[in-house]
UniProtKB/Swiss-Prot annotation:
Belongs to the pseudouridine synthase RluA family. This is Uncharacterized RNA pseudouridine synthase YhcT. InterPro entries: PsdUridine_synth_cat_dom_sf, PsdUridine_synth_RluA-like_CS, PsdUridine_synth_RluC/D, PsdUridine_synth_RsuA/RluA, RluA_PseudoU_synthase, S4_RNA-bd. The keyword RNA-binding applies.
């Protein structure tokens, strides 16, 4: 399989000779049947330079080209803004999101979100793809977040997220001293019926697993610098799990954290690790701390 611009070309080999095109694409690209059918309906697949609209038998020596560039209408309004790009190619984008900005709009016409800035970035670079986030970050959480540029990349990265091979590492400043230096919090999370946005540990909630390691502590100020890795991705997962241990994040007023040091939860997604959806290369993107977290670390954990 070779990359050609924003597409892929497969030269049918002896092993693939006589196979159905769907089978070849599913095996070679990990593409689902709906994705392949969508490519065909939009004339994005060509065999020997001829558009293919239906499944067919391929022969050794056939050249199958898949155009991954998609021309799709999007409800996200492009809006200019600076982006801190950690990684980008024709298939995926990783951004260091600042705190205070939502990942995506919650309603048509909304602006001021990260997705709006990415839509503008795509527009000025001649890319006609939708803004597809692979995972989310809370509005007041900073750090690395992954976007896919086409359906295939999104499907593969989403599968990695489901299989827990897309790794997300966070750094948090929690209140108090944790009892153990490292461990795993395995507590289901559900909605808090007494509050419209808050979550809580609940026996009837969804499975939620967080691994943690204390990197440093400050006994005088009763603060802990904690590195965390998500095995699942529930809303507010780290915030809920640490609060359930009696160690809310500093600045996280929703879950009982004090706000004298920071006016937002002290949580930063410092690293994401994923297998590239097309090349199978291991992509590791590290997001530098924003100024507020950097200053706290320098002051209390230097």
């Amino acid at each position: 399989m070779n990359q050609k611009g924003r597409g892929l070309e497969i030269l049918i080999n002896e092993k693939q000779d006589g196979q159905w095109l769907f089978s070849v694409l599913k095996t070679a690209l990990k593409a689902s049947k709906p994705v392949i059918q969508d490519w065909m309906s939009h004339q994005q697949i060509k065999v020997n330079h001829e558009s293919v609209l239906n499944n067919m038998i391929v022969k050794k020596g056939d050249r199958v080209f898949i155009d991954l560039q998609e021309s799709e209408a999007s409800s996200v309004i492009p809006e200019y803004g600076e982006l801190d790009i950690l990684f980008e190619d024709n298939h995926m984008l990783i951004i260091n999101k600042p705190a205070g900005i939502a990942t995506h709009p919650n309603e048509d016409g909304q602006t001021g979100t990260l997705a709006n800035l990415i839509a503008y970035h795509y527009q000025i670079n001649g890319e006609t793809c939708k803004v597809r986030h692979v995972h989310r970050l809370d509005q007041d959480t900073s750090g690395a977040i992954v976007f896919a540029k086409h359906r295939l990349a999104h499907a593969i990265l989403d599968q990695q997220l489901e299989k827990k091979t897309l790794k997300r590492t966070y750094t948090a400043i929690a209140e108090g001293k944790l009892r153990t230096k490292k461990g795993t919090i395995n507590s289901p999370i559900g909605r808090d019926r007494s509050h419209p946005t808050r979550r809580r540990v609940s026996p009837g909630g969804q499975t939620a697993v967080t691994h943690f390691k204390v990197m440093a502590s400050n006994a005088k100020e009763r603060l802990s610098l904690v590195e965390l890795e998500l095995e699942t991705g529930r809303t507010h997962q780290i915030r809920v799990h640490l609060a359930s241990l009696g160690h809310p994040l500093t600045g996280d007023s929703l879950y009982g954290g004090g706000s004298k040091l920071l006016n937002r939860q002290a949580l930063h997604a410092n690293k994401v690790q994923a297998v590239h959806p097309i090349t199978d290369e291991l992509i590791v993107a590290e997001a530098p701390f924003p100024a507020d977290m950097k200053n706290l670390c320098r002051t209390y954990f230097s």
